[in-house]
Amino acid sequence: MLDFFTIFSKGGLVLWCFQGVSDSCTGPVNALIRSVLLQERGGNNSFTHEALTLKYKLDNQFELVFVVGFQKILTLTYVDKLIDDVHRLFRDKYRTEIQQQSALSLLNGTFDFQNDFLRLLREAEESSKIRAPTTMKKFEDSEKAKKPVRSMIETRGEKPKEKAKNNKKNKGAKKEGSDGPLATSKAAPAEKSGLPVGPENGEELSKEEQIRRKREEFIQKHGRGMEKSSKSSKSDAPKEKGKKAPRVWALGGSANKEVLDYSTPTTNGAPEAAPPEDINLIRGTGPGRQLQDLDCSSSDDEGAAQNSTKPSATKGTLGGMFGMLKGLVGSKSLTREDMESVLDKMRDHLIAKNVAADIAVQLCESVANKLEGKVMGTFSTVTSTVKQALQESLVQILQPQRRVDMLRDIMDAQRHQRPYVVTFCGVNGVGKSTNLAKISFWLLENGFSVLIAACDTFRAGAVEQLRTHTRRLSALHPPEKHGGRTMVQLFEKGYGKDAAGIAMEAIAFARNQGFDVVLVDTAGRMQDNAPLMTALAKLITVNTPDLVLFVGEALVGNEAVDQLVKFNRALADHSMAQTPRLIDGIVLTKFDTIDDKVGAAISMTYITSKPIVFVGTGQTYCDLRSLNAKAVVAALMKA
């Protein structure tokens, strides 16, 4: 039983609607538009909203959307056929009204489609009932049951051809009998060895006697060979030679410890005084108060663009004429066959740029659904049309549904006289502590005091690393510059303690001391480690931070999808709250090491629908950027 079926234009006008079990289809359809159609996630033609499953089909030629909704616990096999039949009949019946392409004509048009829809629904339900469910074949009806048991027995290590030959030989031996040549050939080795095998004085030997004689024959036969081999091995044994002296190379140097020891003899291994730290080296270059946009372009790209324009300028009028004719051919409606080769190249290009394989397939499928049936422009080709649609989809994906403005949220928390809490999580070695220090420097440059909570009580050296960052940040922002106020401080309780308890104490300490922001550093953990994921979910549930940031590196491909999906799933499964807290944003690190392979940004944003808040581009405190969607897409589409 269907809950609803609705037909509406891409402009938002509902042309016709069928209400089944559901009272209203407004909520589910609005969720479909908001989460799928506007976000360019049309690779899969189904969408789940609460207890409903929605299936939809796009008509790009007439800018229509067909949506059917039913309970997700039901398995309705006729839905795909029904939506295709309704799409075909509705388009053919009301082609004139739809082709006018004006909102007024659509509003004034009468789309009496109720009887036709009920007829199509009845036919689809009857066709699904006619199809009898397939039953499993019984063993008696299978081919294996007709074979004899002996033919299915195979000897280990025996090939099928050898087995067939052995069976033929055994059959031939049975036909010839014991008086044939086979019996005489078997008796020959017995005469040579002098050990009678057959009957003796009219009496047959017992089994024990036969086994004993065969054992003696085996020992006599193989014992002599072993003696010969031992004698030959003794005679052929080479004489021991003296050890060869090692070769002394002309420029090989010396391996003596005294020669290789360059340490000062007076210090005796004692640590020297630490040299004064270079503030400019620590701070980096560039303004730290305002985040700059990420720039993925380079001089090489400009040179390549200039070089590519030179040969095009040298083309004659003949090439321009052929190009014009090629463009004129493009004015037609697109089909999947036309786009298939172009989409295959686009998919391979995205995978080569580090986009996860599954997401690349879904993106290309979404573009195909978006363009199928659409009429191209007069001077456009299939390649340019598909490429432009893919670029628009990628930009739409990178533009977040919810913008994270930390400075505004911190000011709002100040008005309520409480600290703004940010929790960093992620797998091992992605740069959580380093980028936490970069964000601390950015907040200090904007005049906010920061308390760093060392909740990584597992990794050796984690507290010392944060202590070093705190010392250097204090050198950049000493209390003398801020009226004697301590701008950055480390809160730590050592190793082996409960991370959730340390975070709770740090937040209470920040509230009492008047700190503006608390940055919580957590231990790196793999997404499959259930105990550590439970501890992270406990930390987030108990302390309810204002922002949960997932730190991921830009080097990963398919692993990014697995990490984010399992982190979100683990936080939801191990949370004790009624509405579990999930990841709010992403920090993308090591972006300076990937050149133009920026596909991880697409993978992470597509799988979570969460924004990339910060991008790490280096080792100094100023190497922090905000994401520029158009620059990332331009780098991604660069050949």
From Swiss-Prot:
GO terms for cellular component: endoplasmic reticulum membrane; signal recognition particle receptor complex. Pfam families: SRP-alpha_N, SRP54, SRP54_N. The keyword Endoplasmic reticulum applies. It comes from the Eukaryota. GTP binds at residues 426-433, 521-525, 589-592. GO terms for molecular function: ATP hydrolysis activity; GTP binding; GTPase activity; signal recognition particle binding. The modification Phosphothreonine is found at T285, T579. Residues 132-317 are annotated as: Disordered. Residues 305-315 have a biased composition (Polar residues). It is a peripheral membrane protein. Residues 137-146, 153-165, 204-240 have a biased composition (Basic and acidic residues). The modification Phosphoserine is found at S178, S297, S298, S299, S474. Keywords: Endoplasmic reticulum, GTP-binding, Membrane, Nucleotide-binding, Phosphoprotein, Receptor. Component of the SRP (signal recognition particle) receptor. Ensures, in conjunction with the signal recognition particle, the correct targeting of the nascent secretory proteins to the endoplasmic reticulum membrane system. Forms a guanosine 5'-triphosphate (GTP)-dependent complex with the SRP subunit SRP54. SRP receptor compaction and GTPase rearrangement drive SRP-mediated cotranslational protein translocation into the ER. Heterodimer with SRPRB. Interacts with the signal recognition particle (SRP) complex subunit SRP54. Belongs to the GTP-binding SRP family. This is Signal recognition particle receptor subunit alpha. It comes from Bos taurus (Bovine). The gene is SRPRA.
